[in-house]
Amino acid sequence: MAAGVRQSRGTAARKVGRRAEVIAALWLMAKGYRILGFRLATPLGEIDLLAQRGKVLAVVEVKQRTTIEDALDAVKPTQRERLRRAATHLAAHRAGLRDLLVRLDLIAMAPGRPPRHLPDAWGGA
């Protein structure tokens, strides 16, 4: 495959990912969450969305695939662990977050379907 084709596919995937994150943020806002950040880089990994509702700090992974089921299956154990470490690091090092209950959520998306939000998606993973 030519380098230009790979690059354009990567660019398209990033656009789809950003759009999915914006839709996920709007979905969470409609459910009463306050969005604290998008694509937050930590030394231990990136967090797609950071949201708060009450005393809960939701660290949200957003996955869009062709089906909701594929999106639900897209986060592998190594990625969950990286997300958990990044969440712990961010909560410990960002002012105002230390006293919140950190929870790892997943928002699964597919074209033509409403987002599916799974609070505590991996049972305290």
Swiss-Prot record:
Pfam families: UPF0102 (PF02021). GO terms for molecular function: nucleic acid binding. HAMAP family: UPF0102 (MF_00048). Belongs to the UPF0102 family. This is UPF0102 protein CCNA_00142. It comes from Caulobacter vibrioides (strain NA1000 / CB15N).
